[in-house]
């Protein structure tokens, strides 16, 4: 569902941010 997509997007953003640190 839409919430799942948003959750996955949030995970991807957080994961990418973690790599930046």
Swiss-Prot record:
Main location: secreted
Domain of life of the organism encoding this protein: Eukaryota
Tissue: Expressed by the skin dorsal glands.
Keyword set, alphabetical order: Amidation, Amphibian defense peptide, Antibiotic, Antimicrobial, Cytolysis, Hemolysis, Secreted
GO biological process entries: defense response to bacterium; symbiont-mediated hemolysis of host erythrocyte
Keyword Cell division found: no
Transmembrane segments: none
Subcellular location: Secreted
Residue(s) carrying Isoleucine amide: 21
Cellular component, GO annotation: extracellular region
Biological function: Has hemolytic activity against human erythrocytes and antibacterial activity against the Gram-negative bacterium E.coli.
Family note: Belongs to the frog skin active peptide (FSAP) family. Ocellatin subfamily.
Name of protein: Ocellatin-3
């Amino acid at each position: 569902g839409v919430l799942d997509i948003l959750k996955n997007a949030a995970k991807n953003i957080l994961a990418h941010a973690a790599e930046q640190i």
